[in-house]
């Protein structure tokens, strides 16, 4: 169990970050744990491992979907169950890998030669769209936000430069100043709700608002495992608030200053032009169909929907 606790801490501390990376890491962790879990308490130990991982990042539905997918294992004997976990984990990991590639192929069609693209945070799905356009010979420049307070934008600019793409780094508060120099915005997603709203890195909704005002297309790159089945049943997405020390140094905190540090915000579907998924470019209104048909949650057993629900109240 020690390796599960270590993996959970890596997710909680954001040593492993990004919705896709978190989902894949969780699937890999469950697969490795299944190989070592005892025969006597296999189901009990697997469930404890799943709940431990689920309790780390409440907003990232990719984590929930990854764990729910792997935990739908089957088998009569313990060995059959063990092999089922391993097989399902590998299937999910393959889903992560192929989805990102397909999103790049579909999304790059909306990036024209000579475009300047704005992006926020560090989304592997969003960057796959930009990188694919560049690989296909299109001249693309990127304006990337710093994405405070965790500075994910620094990762983005490094990855773009490594790919040979011209990039300008700006502070988050300068988005509206630069929005008229942009041809489109491409961001990733932590969660897509049943009504088509986007939950993503704090600051995303302000970019969407600025883009709407400037009539700049706002596109979301999101794998279908980032769509939230829980919102189909009326549950609201919990917005994680992180440590005040990410925002302010101790000399400020010791003055008794109250600090709020939400990690995510909500962008209404009215501000989203299109969601680029591995199954196609869809309007946000189609999120309900993705959840019920692609994820198969229309009539699924209640146990699978409410796994570890006490952590999401």
Swiss-Prot record:
Q: Any keyword Nucleus?
A: no
Keyword field: Carbohydrate metabolism, Isomerase
* Known catalytic reactions: alpha-D-ribose 1,5-bisphosphate = D-ribulose 1,5-bisphosphate
Enzyme type, top EC level: isomerase
* Any one GO MF annotation of this record: ribose 1,5-bisphosphate isomerase activity
- Top-level taxon of origin: Archaea
> Does the keyword Glycosyltransferase belong to this entry?
no
Q: What does this protein do?
A: Catalyzes the isomerization of ribose 1,5-bisphosphate (R15P) to ribulose 1,5-bisphosphate (RuBP), the CO(2) acceptor and substrate for RubisCO. Functions in an archaeal AMP degradation pathway, together with AMP phosphorylase and RubisCO.
Any further remark recorded for this protein: Reaction proceeds via a cis-phosphoenolate intermediate.
What is the recorded name of this protein? Ribose 1,5-bisphosphate isomerase
